[in-house]
A protein has these predicted regions:
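C-terminal helix-rich "cap/oligomerization" subdomain common to oxidoreductases
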Residues: 39, 119-162
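NAD(P)-dinucleotide binding in Rossmann-like oxidoreductases
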Residues: 24-29, 39-115, 130-133
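Conserved glycosyltransferase catalytic-site signature
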Residues: 2, 28-32, 134, 141
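Short, flexible active-site loop motifs that bind/organize anionic cofactors or intermediates
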Residues: 5, 102, 127
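A general structural signal for well-ordered alpha-helical segments in protein cores
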Residues: 1-2, 113-117, 141-144
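Generic structural signal for secondary-structure transition and capping sites
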Residues: 10-17, 43, 66, 128, ...
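Oxidoreductase and adenylate-handling cofactor-binding alpha/beta cores
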Residues: 1-21, 34-42
Length: 162
């Protein structure tokens, strides 16, 4: 989820978070809540929960002329729900806040195939990988660290240092 947020917003410059492990009391979080702001002032919010008792994948993107909602993941477990994208567009006729929406359902997962094709092409053609680079992974892990670090209680409890 964080890698998608970075894809849409770039790097986040400000992070506020609340991390808890009150349910199981293990040294890993039960719930993480993060608010992140990028240099343009765009705000992203993440809730990762192990106590929601249902797998969910929802990414809502609010735009000046509409919105995009991503739901579900086509996974082997089928536990994240139906994968679909809903696109809402503001129109001149819809002054009451309602938008024209279109929903597309995805029934086939081609992501692994597409990623392998891109990776193999980069090797064969000696070109850089375009998406999902090791640097992307590193920057996403830095963001994960920043989320844990920005919660004073969590940081002190687990002695997290820069």
């Amino acid at each position: 989820m964080l890698d998608l947020m970075r894809l849409f917003c770039g790097e986040f410059t400000e992070i506020k978070s609340f991390i808890s492990n009150d349910f199981w009391n293990h040294d890993v979080e039960d719930n993480a809540y993060a608010l992140m702001k990028d240099k343009e002032g765009r705000v992203a919010m993440l809730n990762s929960s192990a106590t929601q008792w249902q797998h969910k994948f929802n990414l809502d993107i609010s735009l000046s002329e509409g919105h995009i909602e991503l739901h579900g993941i086509l996974s082997g477990s089928k536990s994240y729900g139906e994968e679909r994208i809903t696109i809402g567009v503001k129109t001149a006729e819809n002054k009451n806040g309602l938008m024209e929406t279109r929903t597309i359902k995805f029934l086939e997962d081609n992501s692994w195939r597409d990623e392998i094709v891109e990776f193999a092409s980069a090797i064969i053609n000696d070109t850089p990988v375009e998406s999902g680079t090791s640097n992307d992974a590193l920057e996403t892990m830095k963001l994960v660290f920043g989320i844990y670090f920005s919660d004073d209680i969590w940081r002190n409890k687990y002695n997290i240092k820069v």
